[in-house]
Amino acid sequence: MKNLKLFLLGLMLCAALPSQAWDRTRHDAIAYIAECNLTPRAKRNIARYLDHSIVYYASWMDKYRDTPEFRNLEHVSYVDADMQLVDTLRKGKTNCVVELMHAIDRLKDYRNMSDSLVRLNLMYVIHIVGDMHCPSHVKYPGCKSGRADLNGKKMSYHAMWDWGVLDGAHGWSYSEYRLLLDTFSKREKAGMAKGTPREWLYETAVACRVIYDWQRADGTYGKQFVTDTYLLPERQLILASYRLAAVLNDLFG
């Protein structure tokens, strides 16, 4: 009973994320590519704690993002002027990447944890490794989202990088992302997956700061903009996939 209460408390705690990164298709694509790069042993061990494929849980946290009771987790990753993760935020809030690192640390001892807590932390890792690579989920000093019109569709500039640009470029299903993007050699995949969540966030912050240089005063973006920019979120998606696989293989493989 105590473990169940802890699980439910943790679930409500993680429900604090008020805005999603990527959308379901992109989250599913990241998880599916990661799953296809898991070792057999990692797959077997993970299956002990999850009832379905990791794809099933890829966007679970977004379902709870509007829950008002808990606001202690930030849904974006704050960085400072040097593109470094800001660990301590205002009013006691916690950077979600910091909590991700805590979840990974806890899972290193998963054999001595209750099944429900392993499941919760595993679901958290699956979601946030994807989230942290989304171009619009790095919060830079002085940068704001604003409104946007992409090929006649009204949305936020934030949402353009969650899904708008990639939808405009491809319109692929999550399985098509795997078929068409998971084409790197074993050595290339290992190179992309090197590092830690803190280092990955720094790389993401450096790579994705340019989206605010691309922001237009009139908020209007067309097909040429998509053509010129889609490789950035596409690259972030594949990095997230291989890094998620690396984390899970390291923990459960």
Language-model segments: what does each one mean?
Residues 11-19:
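Hydrophobic h-region of N-terminal signal peptides that target proteins for export
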Residues 1-8:
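Bacterial N-terminal signal peptides that target proteins for export
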Residues 18-128, 135-253:
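N-terminal, motif-rich segments that launch catalysis or mediate targeting to/interaction with membranes
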